[in-house]
Amino acid sequence: MSEKNLLTALSKMITEQRNPNSMNIDQLSALELVKVINQEDKQVPLAVEKCLAQIAQAVEKIVQAFQNGGRLVYIGAGTSGRLGVLDASECPPTYGVSSEMVVGIIAGGERALRHPIEGAEDNTEQGKAALQAVNFSQKDVLVGIAASGRTPYVIGALEYAKSLGATTVSIASNPNSAMAQIAEIAIDTVVGPEILTGSSRMKSGTAQKLVLNMLTTASMVMIGKCYSNLMVDVQASNEKLKARAIKIVMEATECDRTVAENTLKIAENNAKLAIMMILSDSDKTTAEQLLSKHHGKLRQALVN
């Protein structure tokens, strides 16, 4: 896109407009300034609320993918890419899943997590190549993230995923974006102009984080990664998480600490298995068989 055409496109984007509520922020005290930011931030959950139907639709597609051996893949550039990588990296310790189940891709690669990479987002072919590098297939779900809704890198990835017949989802902060025209499911969190004109790491980034939280949390809950609201598949990989696993077993079963610790030891720190053993009064092997029969869904295994 030529510089003239790009300027024209940017001038039409809500995320590139000047915010009338922040015109004088360079004259405000610290308290006045953070009040303005806070007031603007209140619009973010309201914008996300308007997209709940689309978010739920995406969750259903992600669940189907997981159940059929597929993955959730995030792709973005800059802040959008970093948020995708962040959300993906939280899934293994929180839900005990493989690091391959939810994948985050950022334009420019690992270095781009900490440093700006000039021009990394400007090439559609690089977006396609990034998916090919992780063997993206029809079984997977692609979530393209870009506040502008026009990032070439993300568009290239969405077009490639769509050509394979995979489910495609876009997350943008401008309505009717180029990404939305490609994606099967368009999540347009229109949060309005930023406090700092064009600084989409702010409200737009916050909206993206809220949506990503919903996508992975709801999907993991629906495939049985929690019991009530407890993280029963948590990986007890450090002292804090080991203590949390004990607490989870105690709360789920109403047992004392000694029972929880002893059962967790037998269950090799698997909180879900320990809970199953205690509540079904069964040994480790029987509890494992019951959970396997019900695809790891603890509540269903206990009921049946």
Swiss-Prot record:
Its EC number is 4.2.1.126. Homodimer. The active site is at E90, E121. Keywords: Carbohydrate metabolism, Lyase. It is an enzyme of class 4 (lyase). It catalyses: N-acetyl-D-muramate 6-phosphate + H2O = N-acetyl-D-glucosamine 6-phosphate + (R)-lactate. GO terms for biological process: 1,6-anhydro-N-acetyl-beta-muramic acid catabolic process; amino sugar catabolic process; N-acetylmuramic acid catabolic process; peptidoglycan turnover. It holds the Pfam family GKRP_SIS_N. It comes from Actinobacillus pleuropneumoniae serotype 7 (strain AP76). Specifically catalyzes the cleavage of the D-lactyl ether substituent of MurNAc 6-phosphate, producing GlcNAc 6-phosphate and D-lactate. Together with AnmK, is also required for the utilization of anhydro-N-acetylmuramic acid (anhMurNAc) either imported from the medium or derived from its own cell wall murein, and thus plays a role in cell wall recycling. Pathway: Amino-sugar metabolism; 1,6-anhydro-N-acetylmuramate degradation; Amino-sugar metabolism; N-acetylmuramate degradation; Cell wall biogenesis; peptidoglycan recycling. The gene is murQ. PANTHER family: GLUCOKINASE REGULATORY PROTEIN. Residues 62-225 form the SIS domain. This is N-acetylmuramic acid 6-phosphate etherase.
